[in-house]
UniProtKB/Swiss-Prot annotation:
Chain residue ranges for the region called Disordered: 278-323, 345-368
Name of protein: Uncharacterized protein Rv2084
Origin: domain of life: Bacteria
Gene Ontology cellular component annotations, sorted alphabetically: plasma membrane
Bias-annotated ranges (Basic residues): 301-319
Organism of origin: Mycobacterium tuberculosis (strain ATCC 25618 / H37Rv)
Length: 380
């Protein structure tokens, strides 16, 4: 699930909109708009977690085992969130009370998805960085370095499982190099003559960059009232990104001819720089069109907005958050501070605590947690 850290991302916009609706004494969103919001979260935002790149390099077995644990748990949690939204959708809200209950469930699911996406993003970055560093270590015949990266993958997987099981957010180390910088740093050293190199070592770096650093650009799904316009706007950009990706793949093809190492490193240096630019463009495009349709639809249904309060960041298309936001500890992946537990008002949802301390009971549904409220949302 590609979730942007930008404050104007789709996740952030919808969280702010739901919070604004729940904070007021009277909901401005009608049943139809609330149901459409539920569908946006269900089918557009909370997508199936999956790895971006294939497993490559000397850490093949370690990464395969780690992925089975981490992504197995992520998929299980996502299935539980989908169950909540599907059951809520079947109830067909009518009055204000039903709409409020729907928004509470959607907000809980959305914040749980943000937590899971943060854990997935932290693990994926650590995994790719370790695989890239292991390739570099193998080129230097550094068996200890490869073993250290293997331990790094196991540790990242254990931290991800711990974060999901104990309902804590991911802790990303800002000082660690991104995966592309690991390869690029070694390429720079070799180009400057700091390290002796040959065609085989340069070729290993080229193949590692192909498999670990350059996934195919994704065509993100458009949903809502801007569906056609969103697809038309991104079509030319996405087509160009794919063309550039295909050109890079042609250079980094596995059947690359055995040219001199200097030429291979020069080509790889240019490719790595282009990878950074393409990734930035795609991320900006994904975050930029994340919430426009929802905001436009809300104005169309509910009329003009009330004047913004002093101190709000209307220029960033983001309502102010008091207690719920990116930096708020979310706690239980399926329940957040100040908001009632997911599915609390759904009929037939029994509370059965799980044996392993996780957020699911044996039937696979979210477990009930202690009811917590936040007066700032008007839920007291």
């Amino acid at each position: 699930m590609p979730v942007s850290d930008d404050s104007s991302s789709a996740f952030d916009l919808i969280c702010a909109e739901i919070e604004r609706q729940l904070r007021g004494g009277e909901l401005l969103m009608d049943a139809a708009a609330a149901s459409e919001l539920l569908l946006t979260v269900r089918y557009q935002l909370d997508t199936q977690p999956r790895p971006l790149v294939i497993v490559h390099g000397p850490l093949f077995q370690a990464v395969k085992a780690a992925r089975a644990q981490v992504y197995g748990r992520l998929i299980q949690l996502r299935h539980a969130r989908c169950e909540v939204l599907d059951e809520r959708w079947q109830l067909r809200p009518t009055g204000q009370r039903d709409v409020r209950a729907l928004l509470i469930d959607v907000l809980n699911v959305l914040l749980a998805a943000i937590t899971a996406a943060g854990v997935e993003r932290a693990y994926a970055c650590a995994e790719r960085r370790a695989m890239a560093a292991a390739v570099v270590a193998k080129n230097y015949r550094d068996a200890l370095g490869v073993e250290l990266q293997c331990n790094s993958v196991c540790r990242a997987a254990a931290e991800a499982i711990h974060a999901l099981a104990h309902r804590t957010g991911a802790t990303e180390d800002a000082d660690c190099l991104p995966p592309v910088d690991v390869i690029h740093a070694d390429v720079t050293r070799r180009m400057h003559g700091e390290v002796a190199t040959d065609v085989v070592a340069a070729g290993e770096l080229v193949i590692a960059a192909r498999h670990l650093l350059d996934p195919m650009p994704r065509g993100e799904l458009s949903y809502g009232p801007l569906h056609e316009g969103g697809n038309a706007a991104r079509k030319s950009v996405y087509r160009r990104l794919v063309q550039l990706w295909q050109a890079r793949r042609a250079v980094t093809d596995g059947d690359v001819d055995l040219r001199d190492a200097r030429t291979l490193l020069t080509d790889l240096d240019s490719i790595l720089r282009e990878m950074r630019t393409a990734a930035t463009i795609q991320q900006s495009g994904t975050a930029g069109d994340g919430g426009g349709g929802r905001r436009q639809d809300s104005r169309r249904r509910n009329g003009p907005r009330r004047p913004a309060r002093r101190g709000t960041s209307r220029g960033r298309r983001c309502a102010p958050r008091v207690a719920i936001g990116w930096h708020t500890p979310i706690g239980d992946p399926l329940a957040v501070e100040g908001v009632e537990e997911i599915g609390a008002s759904l009929p037939g949802r029994e509370s059965t605590p799980s044996d392993d301390g996780g957020s699911l009971h044996p039937s696979g549904r979210p477990r009930r947690v202690h009811r917590r409220r936040w007066c700032g949302l008007g839920l007291c």
